[in-house]
Each structure stands twice: as C-alpha cells, then as structure tokens.
C-alpha cells in the first residue's frame, strides 16, 4: 500500500502524526531493529512500520523469548509472521528467569522499587527509620537508594514522584515486615534489556524501535519527553506510538484490522509480558487465568515468584488496614 494512500483517509491527528514521523524516521535510517512482544502495543507498531517501510529496507523484528511466555503469545508471533510476510527473530535470555531470581532476587511491586530495594540490600541496610543525613553517614555509598527510602529527591527531579512515598504505606510496611529474601529487577535485565543491547550491537543497527506509550504511566513512560532520540555513540531510539492514548489504540485497531493474541481475546488479560510477573498489579487475576488456560506455567510461576506474591499480598493487606484506620480517624 502506497504511503499516500495510507494517510489519505486518516482523520485522527495522533495517528496521522505517527505515520508521518515513522515514515521520516524509517526512511533516514539504514538498519533498524523493532521489538516485538506479541502484546497489543507491539502489534500496532509492527502494522504501522510495515505500512511506511520501503521495499528492501533492512528491518529486523526481534522477539525476546524470556522462557516465561504464554503459548498464546508464541502462536501469535507465528500469526504475525504469516500475516505480514516477515521474519520475527527469536532471542533467548542471557540468564534464565529462574536463574536470575535465584542469584539476584525476586521482582517486587515495580522495576524501580525492586532496583532501590536491591541497592539497599547490597549495602546490608537494616530498614531503619532515620533521617537521610543520618543514614547517609552509615551507608555512604548508597545515596540514590537512600533518597528513595527517605523521600528526599528534589521536586525538580523527574523521579520525585516515584520515591517510596509514591506507594502509600510501603515504607511503614517494610519497617514492620522487613524482607527476609533478596529483591531485584535483574530478571528483566537478563531476559530483555541486556539481550536487546547485545542484539543491536551484533546487527550494527542505527535505529531501535519500541512500543512504549506515555499513557501506560509509571516511571518508564514518564521519563520520555519525545518519541525520537538521536545518539552519536550507539543507535537512535524511536517510540512510534509514544503519544497514543487508549482511544487512539482502539481507533487504529478498528481502522486497520489489527488482531491481537488469545491472551486478550480469549484469556481476557489487560496486558501481556512475562507470565505471572509480580509487577502486574492484577497478578492475582492473571494467576487465575494462567491456572485455567496454561496450568503448566502456573506451577512454574509459583515456584519462581512465590515469595514475591506472598510479600505483595501482605503489603496489600497492610495497606487495607492502615487505610481503614485513617478513615476512622477522619470520620
């Protein structure tokens, strides 16, 4: 389909702008990698790029098979290959998720929370409720994580809103229930992030495309101010649907007949990723879904992430009780 024909009928300004920008960016790069996850956002990215690419353009669609993937996702990857006539290159983790969890710790609540708690644990932090200056004297090489723990980031810092106070009662919970196991976000790094860097280096790409959206929220979306970033020492970064809101997604899907995996259409999941990831705020619902549709994966998730699930449940129960106390005081 000619690009002019693609954009001719587009009435949504966000979608129109994404086509124009994607065409400009793709045309001005020579070797491109595009991350494909089998999720809804990456489905749109793949469709969009296929609509703007010129014949012969070197584009590598890459899928990071973490080892904890729904069969529905694996099937969908094959469906995408057949639909668009492309090859989606599969890449395995540098370290498996079970090995990463065993070596570094389980993920808890969010990537950023896990990273901060991992840093504190690495310095044998005692989960103390002391002022920042006092703690910094005791743990002088852990400044950033201590700022998180003490809610000490400046309001001008882009991560201020993600200090520990962002998760209500989390500090109080940890003080009352210090973790007795290691916490880490390393499984994400070894299953996806570091793999992506390795692949891009080996392919010698000059552009990397990912399907992140600002509307997703969280620190990942908040840190991006533009859909395109150039780099002199590695590859440029492009986020084709960064500005898509949920209604833009739906409009695109309907306009261009974008089909999603059974994870959405049959299982009823809100989003996909590593199966049973403890970062999912609806992990209980997902566990029920896994047990129903892919029971072998359910057993694996319990064995790998069980400590994180239990700790999160305790935190949610603690939160509920603290909120009830606060409500009584206010009534």
Predicted ranges, named:
Residues 2, 234, 246-331:
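ATP/NTP-dependent adenylation/nucleotidyl-transfer catalytic domains that generate, transfer
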Residues 2-248, 253-255:
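ATP-dependent adenylation/nucleotidyltransferase module used to activate substrates
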């Amino acid at each position: 389909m000619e690009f002019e024909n693609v954009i001719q009928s587009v009435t949504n300004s966000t979608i129109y702008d994404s086509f124009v920008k994607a065409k400009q960016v793709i045309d001005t790069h020579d070797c491109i990698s595009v991350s494909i996850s089998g999720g809804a956002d990456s489905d749109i990215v793949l469709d969009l790029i296929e609509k703007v690419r010129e014949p012969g353009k070197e584009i590598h669609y890459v899928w990071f098979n973490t080892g904890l993937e729904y069969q529905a996702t694996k099937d969908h990857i094959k469906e995408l290959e057949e639909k668009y006539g492309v090859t989606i290159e599969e890449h395995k983790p540098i370290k498996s998720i079970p090995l990463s969890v065993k070596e570094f710790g389980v993920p808890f609540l969010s990537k950023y929370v896990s990273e901060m708690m991992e840093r504190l644990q690495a310095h044998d932090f005692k989960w103390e409720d002391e002022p920042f200056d006092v703690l910094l004297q005791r743990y002088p090489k852990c400044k950033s994580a201590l700022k998180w723990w003490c809610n000490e980031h400046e309001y001008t810092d882009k991560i201020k809103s993600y200090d520990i106070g962002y998760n209500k009662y989390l500090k109080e919970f940890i003080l009352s229930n210090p973790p007795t196991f290691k916490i880490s976000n390393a499984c994400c790094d070894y299953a996806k992030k570091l793999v992506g860097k390795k692949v891009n280096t080996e392919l010698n790409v000059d552009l990397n495309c990912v399907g992140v959206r600002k509307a997703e929220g969280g620190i990942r979306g908040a840190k991006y101010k533009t859909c395109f970033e150039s780099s002199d020492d590695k590859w440029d970064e492009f986020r084709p649907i960064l500005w898509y809101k949920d209604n833009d997604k739906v409009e695109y899907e309907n306009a261009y007949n974008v089909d999603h995996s059974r994870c959405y259409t049959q299982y009823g999941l809100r989003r996909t990723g590593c199966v049973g990831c403890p970062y999912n705020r609806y992990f209980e619902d997902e566990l029920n879904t896994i047990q129903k549709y892919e029971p072998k994966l359910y057993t694996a998730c319990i064995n790998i992430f069980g400590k994180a699930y239990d700790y999160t449940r305790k935190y949610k129960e603690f939160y509920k009780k603290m909120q009830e106390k606060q409500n009584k005081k206010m009534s």
